[in-house]
């Protein structure tokens, strides 16, 4: 039996959804308002960052596209937090935003399962609370077995630049008015959110000698775990750093009423971790300066991007601010910054599969769920696509737990909590961040990916071969005493200590130690680093594993969808309200809902066992 899934929107979430669905050999209608905006990066010209870069790698292992697209269009790579612990390290890449968009457009054309349609979806076809398709602006219908809505910041969106307000999407594109209204009419609860973007500057109008060059010594970096064609350092495009100053701060504080953020035009909540420059200066007046990163946008564009300077000031004030920055005295602004306000929908209206609770086979992914960022959007698109396909194929859902992936952390947060501002993934959100690392993504997810048919046999067998060598080395380290290695005999008084325990010392590096071992243990630096992390942080990881097992046991205790929590004695009223609203499918999910405590879980567990 053949199926058709319609994906509304072709940004980072929509593209991942479309491509992953196509891997299940299911036909996809991919709807986009303007084909020229397919795969666009309307804000920052970068992929990755703390937690986000790990998500991009998780997407890659699970058969997604973002990592490959970024690697094919990278201008520069950085390993962030390299001087800190492994739990917070992640890759970030400056990308060629035009090349990135063109790459995705070419991939869509090559995919025989994806039917690209330039049109606007204005309503859904629903029968008996089950999706049947979408209605287009011209009145035509696209019958579909499932629909995934990935509309980004386009729903009833407005842009703000000073006192100028326009009904449009990012980069002066069309917006979507009717779809959001019709979703609200069907009972979905909405929230109004806001984000912003900085002005773009003509790169030849700047004096880079007055800026601080961002030194980059990172080599052999890539998002895709299968990509070994690394971008050489000498070919990487540099970024620069400048800072705001007191003159800029005084100018901003004097002219706050000329910003849409402060003149009453915008009531929507903006991103907590990415505020506008006027918001930063106003809220953090004690700070003498703020960082502004000068970043390339594309080899085929004559503009640069100012990370850290998003604004909704009038063009006149924007120009004054820019020309007070070091090296920007003669700066020419090619495009002014603006704020954008849009509809999102409360994500606690979704199941952990990202299927809506109100309408069967309807899925939401990306910024429609109140998230910010390309990586968060792509991760949701991937998971919505996988689960939409699996459901049609009558296979079990694919849900990543908080201890398995950052994607799991994000989706669990979204469906169990109430979002009040644009959600951004942070390492601090993950309780198991020492396990959810940049280096062990394959180890965590490739088996699941292979079982889903999203990783090919050759890639999986290469991983198993590498894993076997890794375990052989670990076994050798555990069973070999320091005294047996001549080069180490006099460096340690305790010669009976195993090499494994010897490597737990902070000053010992496994890659140096390995040079004195037999040739068959000479593994690649990436694998050695992974082993070293696991040895040095063994105690913490084991503690996490113990908790994982407890969580796994809870996940096996199912809760009926119609379960009445009022019948459970000693259950807190907040827990009754939250659980009745969310309807978790098992105790593990119930335990992660904000407002549900340990005693509540024990009470429910006891009740379920008593009344089985």
UniProtKB/Swiss-Prot annotation:
Belongs to the MnmG family. Homodimer. Heterotetramer of two MnmE and two MnmG subunits. It holds the Pfam family GIDA. SMART domains: GIDA_assoc_3. It is found in: Cytoplasm. FAD binds at residues 9-14. Disulfide bonds: none annotated. Keywords: Cytoplasm, FAD, Flavoprotein, NAD, tRNA processing. This is tRNA uridine 5-carboxymethylaminomethyl modification enzyme MnmG. GO terms for cellular component: cytosol. NAD(+) binds at residues 270-284. Its cofactor is FAD. The gene is mnmG. One of its GO terms (biological process) is tRNA methylation. One of its GO terms (molecular function) is flavin adenine dinucleotide binding. NAD-binding protein involved in the addition of a carboxymethylaminomethyl (cmnm) group at the wobble position (U34) of certain tRNAs, forming tRNA-cmnm(5)s(2)U34. The keyword Transmembrane helix does not apply. PROSITE patterns: GIDA_1 (PS01280), GIDA_2 (PS01281). Gene3D superfamilies: FAD/NAD(P)-binding domain (3.50.50.60), GidA associated domain, C-terminal subdomain (1.10.150.570), tRNA uridine 5-carboxymethylaminomethyl modification enzyme MnmG/GidA (1.10.10.1800).
